[in-house]
Amino acid sequence: MRAPARGTGCCGRSGGRWLAGAAQPRCLWAGGAGQRFMVPGGTMKSLKKDSRLRITPTRLLEASENVKEKKRAKGPEQPTPTIQEEPEPVSNVLQGDDILALAIKKEDLKEQHIPRLTEKEDKRVITQKFIIRKLKPMDPRRKVCHLVARPANPDEATKPLDYSGPGDSFDGSDQILPHHILGSLQDFKRIALARGNTQLAERIPTSPCLMTLISAEGESKQKAPKEEKRPPWAPPPQHNFLKNWQRNTALRKKQQEALSEHLKKPVSELLMHTGETYRRIQEERELIDCTLPTRRDRKSWENSGFWSRLEYLGDEMTGLVMTKTKTQRGLMEPITHIRKPHSIRVETGLPAQRDASYRYTWDRSLFLIYRRKELQRIMEELDFSQQDIDGLEVVGKGWPFSAVTVEDYTVFERSQGSSSEDTAYLGTLASSSDVSMPILGPSLLFCGKPACWIRGSNPQDKRQVGIAAHLTFETLEGEKTSSELTVVNNGTVAIWYDWRRQHQPDTFQDLKKNRMQRFYFDNREGVILPGEIKTFTFFFKSLTAGVFREFWEFRTHPTLLGGAILQVNLHAVSLTQDVFEDERKVLESKLTAHEAVTVVREVLQELLMGVLTPERTPSPVDAYLTEEDLFRHRNPPLHYEHQVVQSLHQLWRQYMTLPAKAEEARPGDKEHVSPIATEKASVNAELLPRFRSPISETQVPRPENEALRESGSQKARVGTKSPQRKSIMEEILVEESPDVDSTKSPWEPDGLPLLEWNLCLEDFRKAVMVLPDENHREDALMRLNKAALELCQKPRPLQSNLLHQMCLQLWRDVIDSLVGHSMWLRSVLGLPEKETIYLNVPEEQDQKSPPIMEVKVPVGKAGKEERKGAAQEKKQLGIKDKEDKKGAKLLGKEDRPNSKKHKAKDDKKVIKSASQDRFSLEDPTPDIILSSQEPIDPLVMGKYTQSLHSEVRGLLDTLVTDLMVLADELSPIKNVEEALRLCR
């Protein structure tokens, strides 16, 4: 075998030979098996020995460099040109020993590869014992760290403080979490970026909201794939109720099956199902409790009805009373029935429960069976709504729905033209519609029903429906649903077909405005070859909600079923989408909250009504009506003036009571009644109902009228008050009194109170117009018109004279100061004090005599008169002080003639006598006996008079000064003398 080409397998000059005398390298590697190489200048043994050595490339390069340097060094030493000698011819043929030397031995392979021990070989286990010293770990709790402060080396350069902490303080994560640092991550990142530490800033995660903002700013990022639109009928993803129910139901089934196998019991007898009948038992107990009070045995009689006693918590004074429940008050709630439908029981793996025969349960009690029979009629009346739970079960889904139903009308049996053989053959086809072998002649399987050619056909059957396929669709508006109809040619003849729409009368033809197509399918004509299966796909889609129908006829040639129609009925229901679901939920939550608040409020009100004391009956509306209010109500356009209205009252009494006085003057003429008096009585009888007050007529009952009238008459008899006319309420009660006979004249002397004016000018005018005397009528009309004119004028607003009031108050202060100084002088000089005695004298009806008199009595009294006088003095002094205070409070209202307070002050007036002599001479009183005065020293009396005069001068000087100042402040232009005159 020859050596390989130059430059392959050996290192040296490519394509050349080694120079003479140079160190010739040996072969670095051997060829594969079966190749032999001849190495010049060496033997087989040296080649075998050198083949085991490894020469690195670095050593090879060093050797080549050494050869080149030797060549360069020998160049100048041999100036004479060298004679090139021809090298000896090298034989490239390998000898036998060389071939054996190139063979690979196992020993060489073992030296190159370390042998591995196999698992099958026995391993020698060498055990050695070593003693290892193990230190006891220190308790970390006892470790104490001490910090020792030492002065820093001044030569060391100060380093900036680093607050980032150790490098591995982030729990081995690449990100910096909020609990790694003090403060917020945003501030930390901002400071790191300000310092240029971007590597640290990148380790801070960005919050989702910031990522959203960054992406919204316009970063070119790849958009996420669009989520597939979920159908509107699908529930939200978080509402996986059905999945949870199915998972829990499957776990429950496995659990109860395992328990049933382990305990050797049926599923219905497991302990986990013993409470299934508890609800039914409770309902029956409640129903029996409701019917028990109707029995005569009086069971639960005391605590079950509205006649039961109230329960007290505590005593009757400070405790609480428990109100009755709704059931005790007769407001029983209907019994609620709760059951499990059959499908739920099957789904949960709970069959119909049957109690074991050896168990004596509550239902098998003989007493209960007897009670049921006894109370059966009443229980049926109370619990009349026995619902069938299985019948109330609703099973359905909100997904698009489509269904195909087929009706085969046997109209061919009535065909007169068809033979019995054809009829029998058709029945055979109908019974064996799934026969795979073809039928001779034209034949179709229309929606699974056979439709074949009939030899003889009846013309009457051509308009009859042979096979009707109903396709039903149900979906939401805007959604699409589909259904398929299959037609198979199971005959031996090709059949041509086409579609024709049938016209159906529509009741609401006028109401349909648009004729939009909603059913879609391939209605082109075509041919069905023998053995071919043709599938027609029908689609339905509607943009509006409603019920839609279409009827199509599948026509064939040749005609099948003797000319009967192969009909396809399309019926679809499009439902409205719930686009306001969110708004409805919000509204439902608001209504639920409002309902809860309303229920709580009603419950609280009901509880409070059962606990709180009922409110006191309010006073009637017209209890505080005054004469002015009644006048304004009955005369809206007029204005009330007290003096004018009083004059009208006086005019009424003057002319309306005149006939009554005339009747009293002639007591013997009672039987003779003039026609004028009769006419006047009838007119007054007509006017009497009109005088009644419309305000208080429906509010004051008759017993109260009588009680008030009796109390008024009793007060009149006592004599405490004897007013000339009654109060406003008494007038109303007298007018409303049913005791006054409408047929009697108000002037008849029956002892009844005289009819008063009802404050209505129109009634006044009518009463004046029926007066018999013309002169009286003219005079009354003239005065009435004059009063009406005065009442038509709007009253001027009252202006209070502040200067007059202040002057009067200053004058009263001067008098009080003078009296106080006089009493002080008398006490200092030892003079006797003056006493004032007030006496109440009864006042006659039309006289104004002074009811209160002032008597000055010296201190030197003796006996019973002195004690009596002192007691009367204390009593009357207290009355006087009260009246003075009352007068000071009502000072600003004294000059108001229209004030309401003047009505009660016409009865009493306080008048003081000018002097004691006038009282003793003109109106002597025998009940008072004055004792003789004690002698007074004239010198002391002179000092008293002189001091009193000087005090009067000082008080008057102060009064005049204050009056001048006030006059200048209030009205500087007004004459002060006029104010002084007014004060007098």
Curated annotation (Swiss-Prot):
Residues 61-88, 218-240, 693-729, 842-917 are annotated as: Disordered. Interacts with MYCBP. This is MYCBP-associated protein. The modification Phosphoserine is found at S619. Its main location: cytoplasm. The gene is MYCBPAP. It is found in: Cytoplasm; Membrane. May play a role in spermatogenesis. May be involved in synaptic processes. Keywords: Cytoplasm, Developmental protein, Differentiation, Membrane, Phosphoprotein, Spermatogenesis. One of its GO terms (cellular component) is endosome. Expressed specifically in testis. It comes from Homo sapiens. One of its GO terms (molecular function) is clathrin binding. The modification Phosphothreonine is found at T613. GO terms for biological process: cell differentiation; chemical synaptic transmission; endocytosis; spermatogenesis. Transmembrane segments: none annotated. Residues 218-231, 862-910 have a biased composition (Basic and acidic residues).
